[in-house]
Each structure stands twice: as C-alpha cells, then as structure tokens.
Amino acid sequence: MFKKIITPRISETNITGHIGHTVIPVWLEEGYEEIILLFSRNLAEPSLITVNMNMDFLHEIFFGKDVEILTSVKKIGTSSFVLHQEGYQDGKPCVRASTTLVHFDYSTHKPDPIPKTFLDILNEHLSVSS
C-alpha cells in the first residue's frame, strides 16, 4: 500500500468552504505517483495512461487539516491494472476511488503487456480486501 499526505491549500476551497470536487482527482493522481514513476522513470517517455476513474464522495474535506491518501492495487490484468484509493481526514473516510491504468505503447498507440518486473511489484501491493 502506498500512503501520501496532502495538505489542502486555501485556493482549493470552494464557495461552501470545503475542498472542491475538481481538486480530488489531482490528489488521487498524487497518491499513485510512485506507481507512475515505477513504470516511467523518464516522464518524457510515459508508459501508462488512465482510462477510467470513479469516485465516491463520502464526506466533505476541509482546509486546515491534512488528508491521507491510501493506494493499493485492486486487480491486475495482462496490460492494465486497477487501483483502489481512499482519502481520510481526521481518520474519517472522505473519498473512495477506483482508477484503471493501461500499460501503453505510444509508438503503436496500443496497449502493451505489463512486463514481469512490474507485475511482481504490483503484486506486492495487491489488496484482497479492496
């Protein structure tokens, strides 16, 4: 499991005083940044694309208190994998998300099988309870 602490910025609040819903996908992507870097040490040559992201907003998130993003691998396929993410503020679940990433060959514009070395790493973070 990967853990990332996000410190909300005042600019991320909306008129109702809590963090805007458009901010959360950015935070979730920060939560799986380590996974992106495993596949693409050189960000000028990416090898993953996001093909799906679903979020459930469970509770408002407020400025002034850190948010913990937990990321685990939910499912692994031949050329894709699904991440499960949860965001907590003060120990309270605030957001739950599922994101599908595809190992992608930009030269052919087609999915590419995930190399065994990366499969092994993903399997280390596979969660049976997600």
What are these regions (language model features)?
Residues 1-52, 106-130:
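Hot-dog-fold acyl-thioester-processing enzymes
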Residues 1-4, 62-63, 74-130:
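HotDog/MaoC-like acyl-thioester-processing domains
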Residues 6-8, 55, 71, 85:
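Preference for bulky hydrophobic residues occupying beta-strand positions
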Residues 35-80, 95-96, 102:
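Hydrophobic beta-strand-centered segment that forms part of the acyl-chain substrate-binding groove
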